[in-house]
């Protein structure tokens, strides 16, 4: 179910008001020729051919498709995957960023793709790392349009003086 919470109240004897809170979509994976959306805990929410704006496409999750059930946790090999994906998704929403895809490489690495730019964000400090992406992408687009490359944020800390960008030819 995509409903996280529902509250019904009577506004007056003839009016019932329903307050519905939907579960947030942390990402989606390709599944049986559709998109399978999941929440921050890895619960399969629903399948759809539709792609929702602001929800990242996720690669790198290993699971047995025959064991997936809507409303149940997706049976992935690495349970920490959803924690990292949910954490990254939270800050992508906060900073109004939608990557073309999010790749869960392993428990040590999440990689975001924005066009031809690959952003390595590691597995911690997501807020300060993701906060840097939008201004950097804008600067790259302005100074080096269409330049493919790797943005190294995996070791970036709040007191870091610089961020490396490795262009690809």
Predicted regions and their residues:
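Charged, solvent-exposed interaction patches on well-folded alpha/beta domains
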Residues: 2-169
């Amino acid at each position: 179910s995509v409903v996280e919470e529902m509250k019904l109240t009577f506004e007056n004897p003839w009016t019932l008001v329903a307050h519905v809170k939907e579960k947030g979509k942390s990402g989606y994976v390709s599944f049986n020729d559709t998109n399978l959306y999941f929440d921050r805990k890895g619960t399969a929410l629903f399948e759809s051919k539709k792609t929702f704006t602001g929800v990242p496409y996720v690669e790198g999750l290993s699971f047995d498709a025959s064991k997936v059930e809507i409303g149940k946790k997706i049976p992935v090999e690495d349970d920490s995957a959803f924690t990292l994906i949910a954490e990254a998704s939270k800050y992508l929403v906060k900073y109004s960023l939608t990557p073309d895809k999010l790749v869960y490489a392993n428990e040590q690495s999440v990689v975001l793709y924005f066009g031809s730019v690959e952003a390595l964000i590691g597995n911690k400090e997501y807020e300060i790392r993701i906060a840097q992406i939008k201004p950097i992408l804008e600067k790259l687009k302005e100074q080096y349009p269409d330049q493919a490359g790797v943005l190294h944020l995996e070791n970036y800390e709040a007191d870091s003086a610089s961020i490396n960008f490795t262009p690809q030819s």
